[in-house]
């Protein structure tokens, strides 16, 4: 039996629940992916909406997996947490692909991983995100961005659109459309079609 590719979901307290639960719904339906939940030290992590997830220490993760990081109010202290940033930088840098949702891109930017790359983020937090990553080519109008192995989405629900786009890139458009239909989701297939564009 062929080994599944690990999807390493990195969590921290006060992450935004839909940032992760939406993309997980998509990724778990893709053939050959296995979902794993991690944090710096392991244990129970609580989302901003008080959902609890039992995580393992990130140090047990497959470095070559797919690294996924959400946003949410927990990213505000996270960008100043040197221990967490060191771990995030290592695993995101070594990953085969790196996906961030909402203000998760601010954390990647703080690690220097998005320097010189195109990226986007939650439009309501855009000023703060820009201040974190001044060397990033931030796109104010984008549902999601792809630059090399890095995928970054706009706020919250945009993570589902981005993840379906990621699936289309990996497995073909038909696979992504089928998953969207399976979850009864109206997919915005155009990464530049951003109804929440920052004016």
Describe these PLM feature segments.
Residues 1-98, 105-110, 116, 127-132, ...:
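Extended, subdomain-level signal for the structured scaffold at the beginning of enzyme domains
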Residues 141-149:
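Glycine/charged-rich beta-loop-alpha catalytic/anionic-binding loops adjacent to active sites
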Residues 119:
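Anionic-ligand binding patches
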């Amino acid at each position: 039996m062929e080994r599944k590719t690990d999807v390493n979901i990195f969590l921290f307290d006060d992450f935004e629940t839909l940032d992760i639960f939406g993309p997980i719904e998509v990724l778990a339906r893709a053939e050959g992916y296995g979902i794993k939940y991690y944090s710096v030290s392991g244990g129970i992590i609580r989302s901003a909406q008080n959902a609890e997830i039992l995580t393992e220490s990130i140090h047990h993760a497959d470095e070559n997996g797919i690294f996924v990081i959400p946003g949410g109010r927990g990213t505000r202290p996270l960008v100043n947490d040197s221990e967490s940033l060191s771990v995030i930088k290592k695993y995101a840098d070594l990953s085969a692909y790196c996906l961030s949702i909402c203000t998760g891109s601010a954390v990647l930017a703080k690690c220097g991983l998005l320097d010189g790359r195109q990226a986007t983020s939650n439009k309501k937090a855009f000023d703060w995100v820009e201040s974190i990553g001044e060397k990033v080519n931030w796109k104010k109008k984008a549902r999601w961005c792809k630059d090399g192995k890095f995928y970054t989405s706009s706020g919250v629900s945009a993570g589902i659109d981005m993840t379906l786009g990621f699936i289309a890139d990996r497995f073909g458009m038909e696979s992504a459309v089928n998953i969207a239909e399976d979850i009864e989701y109206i997919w915005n297939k155009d990464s530049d079609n951003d109804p929440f564009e920052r004016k």
